[in-house]
């Protein structure tokens, strides 16, 4: 009798495992790197966690956004690895913790697997920004005269020289980041055109 029960138990486990295996399918391939339906479901969950307004978004629209995100991430990761860009976890751990705290503040419960995925996203974004900065920082020019003019139009300009310089540096960094964001989109678009992307 015990042998029969053990056999039935093993059979159930095998069938359950088989069902799970069957459910994993490829939805896209990027330069021989596969993106599965599980990756897609997790990405949709992350999108909903990061922006609760997306909970009411049409499923097909969400899937399109999610698959595009996943493709972009694969391309970014391949480019980062190719250029040997590496950042220590401590570089972005505070940013990650603040992001998780802001999500959980809305009442969203994030499971450990999704937290890990969000951590990897934050890491990827920081390493990608490092790559773009390294490649294009010499192409980024900020017109200081425009910054000076903008400061003149600003209400409550600091009278303290140190505070004024800090504000000026902040505005310069905002402009630099805007221009680097443009280069980021151009660079991603360029590598996307050179890549083999297949949908299933």
Predicted regions and their residues:
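Boundary at the C-terminal end of the N-terminal hydrophobic targeting segment
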Residues: 16-20
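Sec-dependent N-terminal signal peptides
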Residues: 4-13
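Peptidyl-prolyl cis-trans isomerase
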Residues: 21-25, 29, 56-200
